[in-house]
A protein has these predicted regions:
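A hydrophobic, multi-pass inner-membrane permease signature
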Residues: 2-247
């Protein structure tokens, strides 16, 4: 009996030629995909350590030429870098937290049938996706409400995003209604159900919204140009943009 089991394990553990071919094919495909994903980062890196004139003329292809590290020395010795890095980190962290809360909490409210006018307010928020306020109206609005040339001009305008709201609402609607009904029978109120039931079950979509918000906050530098004038409010991306312009 033991011998048969051992032979069965050996037989199961062996791979046929077809299995090996499939494994090799999958490995090659994923290897190529990995190279495609990594190459942009590699290309950027070799450009940073190559001769600037060669980079500007497009003569750098696969390998660096005229290797030097002056670009890194220049960036790391900038006095504007530490405060700009702090501003970028602060806006990314705070902006992401506020955005996640502002997307998930109203989304949960919009899924509740007992609230009057929920469909109207939901459509009112969603319809803003199809219209742009324009640069001048936004500038005047920010100055009127007092956030122009302040740190909060990075946070407040991006708190409520219709796209994130739609994502959260769609996901929350897919959760089993019986879970919330059971919590309601046990005496859980609206806030208790939101914080102790909905949020834990919505971790996947909250992570997605967090990534979208964090990447958007970190990469955005145009609002620094348009809505701030103090150097203390400059973000890391704006400082790097200025360095890039100066090197051209």
């Amino acid at each position: 009996m033991a011998k048969k089991e051992a032979e069965e394990k050996v037989r199961v553990g062996k791979k046929s030629a077809g299995d090996w071919a499939v494994d090799i094919f999958i490995t090659i495909i994923f290897g190529l995909f990995t190279i495609v994903c990594i190459f942009p980062f590699y290309y950027i890196f070799i450009n940073t350590i190559s001769n600037n004139n060669l980079v500007m003329t497009g003569k750098i292809s696969l390998f660096p030429q005229g290797i030097h590290f002056q670009n890194y020395v220049r960036v790391l010795t900038l006095k504007e870098l530490p405060p700009a890095l702090f501003v970028s980190i602060a806006r990314t962290v705070l902006g992401t937290i506020f955005t996640v809360f502002a997307a998930s909490f109203p989304a949960y409210a919009f899924t509740r049938n007992e609230y009057w006018g929920r469909k109207f307010f939901y459509r009112f928020v969603v319809v803003t996706m199809y219209f742009s306020a324009g640069l001048i109206p936004l500038f005047l609005t920010y100055r009127t409400i007092g956030i122009y040339n302040t740190f909060w001009v990075y946070i407040i305008p991006g708190i409520v995003t219709p796209f994130n709201l739609i994502l959260c609402k769609t996901y929350i609607e897919s959760l089993p209604a019986s879970l919330e009904e059971s919590a309601e029978i046990d005496g859980a109120g609206y806030l208790v159900r939101y914080f102790r039931l909905i949020l834990p079950l919505s971790k996947p979509i909250l992570a997605t919204v967090s990534v979208f918000s964090a990447v958007g906050q970190w990469n955005n530098w145009m609002d620094t140009v348009l809505y701030t004038k103090d150097k203390s409010l400059q973000t890391l991306q704006y400082v790097l943009y200025q360095i890039g312009r100066a090197s051209c």
